Swiss-Prot record:
Any one Gene Ontology BP term: mitochondrial electron transport, ubiquinol to cytochrome c
Gene: MT-CYB
Subcellular location, record wording: Mitochondrion inner membrane
Listed name of the protein: Cytochrome b
Record-linked SUPFAM superfamilies: a domain/subunit of cytochrome bc1 complex (Ubiquinol-cytochrome c reductase), Transmembrane di-heme cytochromes
Its membrane topology: Multi-pass membrane protein
Length: 380
């Protein structure tokens, strides 16, 4: 009998072990769909991005016009651009839900998988930031100026570092050129990191909503979860297409329809919605270095999740107190997102400061305390 090609061919064997015959817990819910959705987001972004790069010119005098040209004169250029810009928003929606799922169900206890995931988040944030600068509108220019300027808060080497990043004494042509190069490179880095992420995941197998070993009850990935994933793709593409076709500029900033002008500062500089929570934390501290440290800590705190887990149970499925805390954290992040979009004035300043304090208190102090308390309650 001839050997099964799918199981013996060096390349097909890898595909088979990770997409077809992969043993998967039978009880994983729709919250486990976001990994594959992130994969499809990445593929969509790389394809649309490649098509956009073919018509883009990374030069300060031509960048804005080249984007306008793509939308006006290139076949379906407007659609490709709208899909790429809004695809980024859906990418972040998926990654935030994916992280939330990992947090709720204790998936962070797979330390290597979790850590590579946090590195992926940081790389995605960097990619989105440099990408936002490319259309060279007002918000692109001033966003780049404000965020890169934060590096100057680093003692001793800060100013040198900023000028090195800019390629001059202000955000100008060299900055745009290198940001384009980085924006082209980073998605492929994300793809590589994704393979590492999956390699670590397949060492342990997926977690499940009960947080207990599921070795005794696993089913093949295909056809069960491959079908479920395709349904997920459809549910993702429907709102993406709706947004791109009906209201493509809903999530953008109107300032970006004005070409970059170093002499005119927009009244309110703010990043895209997916960075607003971190921006609110940055602004809540009235000191430059302190703000930068808080901004960095707001994301890097995720690395500490495995060490702050005190509960005897892995998931929050049967931990009502932790659940209450988790949903308070979600509400808190929504408040931070709202505050980030508001001007720096009363009462937004104090709300932002309280929300920032609450964010770190919940993650670093309350979660471990409540986990320990729930362990004690188990004894009654």
């Amino acid at each position: 009998m001839a050997p099964n090609l799918r199981k013996h061919h060096p390349l097909l064997k890898m595909v088979n072990n990770s997409l077809i015959d992969l043993p998967t817990p039978s009880n994983i819910s729709a919250w486990w769909n976001f990994g594959s959705l992130l994969g499809i987001c990445l593929a969509t972004q790389i394809i649309t991005g490649l098509l956009l790069a073919m018509h883009y010119t990374a030069d300060t005098s031509l960048a804005f016009m080249s984007v306008a040209h793509t939308c006006r004169n290139v076949q379906f250029g407007w659609l490709i651009r709208n899909l790429h810009a809004n695809g980024a928003s859906f990418f972040f929606i998926c990654i935030y839900l994916h992280i939330g799922r990992g947090f709720y169900y204790g998936s962070y206890l797979y330390k290597e998988t979790w850590n590579t995931g946090v590195i992926l988040l940081l790389t995605l944030m960097a990619t989105a930031f440099v990408g936002y600068v490319l259309p060279w509108g007002q918000m692109s220019f001033w966003g780049a100026t404000v965020i890169t300027n934060l590096f100057s808060a680093i003692p001793y080497i800060g100013q040198t570092l900023v000028e090195w990043a800019w390629g001059g004494f202000s955000v100008d042509n060299p900055t745009l050129t290198r940001f384009f190069a980085l924006h082209f490179l980073l998605p492929f880095m994300i793809a590589g990191l994704t393979l590492i992420h999956l390699t670590f995941l397949h060492e342990t197998g997926s977690n499940n909503p009960l947080g207990i070993s599921s070795d005794c009850d696993k089913i093949p990935f295909h056809p069960y979860f491959s079908t479920k994933d395709i349904l997920g793709f459809i549910i993702l593409f429907l709102p993406l297409m709706t947004l791109a076709l009906f209201s493509p500029n809903l999530l953008g900033d109107p300032e970006n329809f004005t070409p970059a002008n170093p002499l005119v500062t927009p009244p309110h500089i703010k990043p895209e919605w997916y960075f607003l929570f971190a921006y609110a934390i940055l602004r809540s501290i009235p000191n430059k270095l302190g703000g930068v440290l808080a901004l960095v800590a707001s994301v890097l705190v995720l690395f500490l999740a495995p060490f702050l887990h005190m509960s005897k149970q892995r998931t929050m499925t049967f931990r009502p107190l932790s659940q209450l805390l988790f949903w308070t954290l979600v509400a808190n992040l929504l408040i931070l997102t709202w505050i980030g979009s508001q001007p720096v004035e009363h009462p937004f300043i104090i709300i932002g400061q309280l929300a920032s304090l609450t964010y770190f208190t919940i993650l670093l102090i309350l979660f471990p305390i409540v986990g320990t308390l729930e362990n004690k309650l188990l004894k009654f």
